[in-house]
From Swiss-Prot:
Keyword Metal-binding: no
One GO biological process term: regulation of RNA splicing
Enzyme class: transferase
PTM field: Autophosphorylates on all three types of residues.
Lineage: Eukaryota, Metazoa, Chordata, Craniata, Vertebrata
Record-annotated active site: D288
Gene designation per UniProt: CLK1
Extent of Basic and acidic residues compositional bias: 86-97
Xref: PROSITE patterns: PROTEIN_KINASE_ATP, PROTEIN_KINASE_DOM, PROTEIN_KINASE_ST
Source organism per UniProt: Homo sapiens (Human)
Protein name, entry field: Dual specificity protein kinase CLK1
Keywords: ATP-binding, Kinase, Nucleotide-binding, Nucleus, Phosphoprotein, Serine/threonine-protein kinase, Transferase, Tyrosine-protein kinase
Complex formation: Interacts with PPIG and UBL5.
Length: 484
């Protein structure tokens, strides 16, 4: 029986080993990105006062080591069509994604038209182990000083799972790829949670959600990642999952931040909406939807030289996805934390502390879809007021009734956003953001339909925002339904 109030652990939302990050695809160190949930709230207490207008000096570069380094978007679509260097579209990562590296999935260093006939198979690789805060606890002889289980290839867990590789390691635990010797030698992913009370309790909360979803949908018809089982190993909770491909973010990153094809976006979007609608129908809100938490079932691709951008371009073979990371999922009747979602995908009602429910997931999906379409986020910021200013630049003014209702009065003056468009920050927002429809790369009817869907998902008022049940009937998916 699930608890009426879920245990909340700040590091749960900031874990740098969540399932979406296990299947990485780049050996390059990642830049920080905006904080998820409570970790961001905590750091804001110390860092908000440090923000000043000079921080937004236009001479700053993407390589600045400023704490508030942001993930930059392209100035305009020409930067994308002319084949901008990938670094200009690089995503800023938060602490939950620090120290993450892996081996590239077999790409040749030389462009070749012959490569269009070559199929590449994505592979996982060990992530580098970053520093984390030491915690007072009782350690077993098999734990390191931070609470990680000490293990290596060849070790066997629960007399069944033989470790063959470490896929990820972070503040919350580690993830290993294993051979399941009691299931015909299939490969699985096993999360090994730190032997620390608060982490174990948070893991139990996720297990409750996963058990509910797996019982309700045993065949994974609704594309939520399947938990195969869980067990305890010397004080560590271990969760066994099916092994999936790369996250959609990792695929974009490995592909030089080039966007997905429209037909792939259509299929991915439909599956995401169907999956999350399943959560909503079961009185759950995911609360942390983002490209990192959407994984391909298989991320194999073909590769061919694209003369327009003068580089190799990867094309997925199969765009089928699954939704992962239910550590922050919240039932309707449970306590709702004030701050949820990763910054770039955070709904306005969350920023304004107006309360949230399932519509905040719909907003996140809208942000995800435009990122799939462009290859970059349209909300590259770490600051709430600047985030609201970007929303207004892209979507128009915030509704007065939401402004009047919020207790975040510091963001407003006379029921308007307190924002100076002529300041350095204001010029930055004006330069980097533009009305939503101006991001369209084509006036084709299918592009129009996609942006109509995105606009309905990015409706400010959660009461007026399209539901996922309605979204699944949107004309953008008509071609998909005809092909079934």
């Amino acid at each position: 029986m699930r608890h009426s109030k879920r245990t909340y652990c700040p590091d749960w939302d900031d874990k740098d080993w969540d399932y979406g990050k296990w299947r990485s695809s780049s050996s390059h160190k990642r830049r920080k990105r905006s904080h998820s949930s409570a970790q961001e709230n905590k750091r804001c207490k110390y860092n908000h006062s440090k923000m000043c207008d000079s921080h937004y000096l236009e001479s700053r570069s993407i390589n600045e080591k400023d704490y508030h380094s942001r993930r930059y978007i392209d100035e305009y679509r020409n930067d994308y069509t002319q084949g901008c260097e990938p670094g200009h579209r690089q995503r800023d990562h938060e602490s939950r994604y620090q120290n993450h590296s892996s081996k590239s999935s077999g790409r040749s260093g030389r462009s070749s038209y012959k490569s269009k006939h070559r199929i590449h198979h994505s592979t996982s690789h060990r992530r580098s182990h970053g520093k984390s805060h030491r915690r007072k606890r009782t350690r077993s002889v098999e734990d390191d000083e931070e609470g990680h289980l000490i293990c290596q290839s060849g070790d066997v867990l629960s007399a069944r799972y033989e470790i063959v590789d470490t896929l990820g390691e972070g503040a919350f635990g580690k993830v290993v790829e294993c051979i399941d010797h009691k299931a015909g030698g299939r490969h699985v992913a096993v999360k090994i949670v730190k032997n620390v009370d608060r982490y174990c309790e948070a893991a139990r909360s996720e297990i409750q959600v996963l058990e509910h979803l797996n019982t309700t949908d045993p065949n994974s018809t609704f594309r939520c990642v399947q938990m195969l089982e869980w067990f305890e190993h010397h004080g560590h909770i271990c969760i066994v999952f099916e092994l999936l491909g790369l996250s959609t973010y990792d695929f974009i990153k490995e592909n030089g931040f080039l966007p997905f094809r429209l037909d792939h976006i259509r299929k991915m979007a439909y599956q995401i909406c169907k999956s999350v609608n399943f959560l909503h129908s079961n009185k759950l809100t995911h609360t942390d939807l983002k490209p990192e938490n959407i994984l391909f079932v298989q991320s194999d691709y073909t590769e061919a030289y694209n003369p327009k951008i003068k580089r190799d371009e990867r094309t997925l073979i199969n765009p089928d996805i699954k939704v992962v990371d239910f550590g922050s999922a919240t039932y309707d009747d449970e306590h709702h934390s004030t701050l949820v979602s990763t910054r770039h995908y955070r709904a306005p009602e969350v920023i304004l502390a107006l309360g949230w429910s399932q519509p905040c997931d719909v907003w996140s999906i809208g942000c995800i879809l435009i990122e799939y379409y462009l290859g970059f986020t349209v909300f590259p910021t770490h600051d709430s007021k600047e985030h609201l200013a970007m929303m207004e630049r892209i979507l128009g003014p915030l509704p007065k009734h939401m402004i009047q209702k919020t207790r975040k009065r510091k963001y407003f003056h006379h029921d308007r956003l307190d924002w100076d468009e002529h300041s350095s920050a204001g010029r930055y927002v004006s330069r980097r953001c533009k009305p939503l429809k101006e991001f369209m790369l084509s006036q084709d009817v299918e592009h129009e339909r996609l942006f109509d869907l995105i606009q309905k998902m990015l409706e400010y008022d959660p009461a007026k925002r399209i539901t996922l049940r309605e979204a699944l009937k949107h004309p953008f998916f008509d071609l998909l339904k005809k092909s079934i």
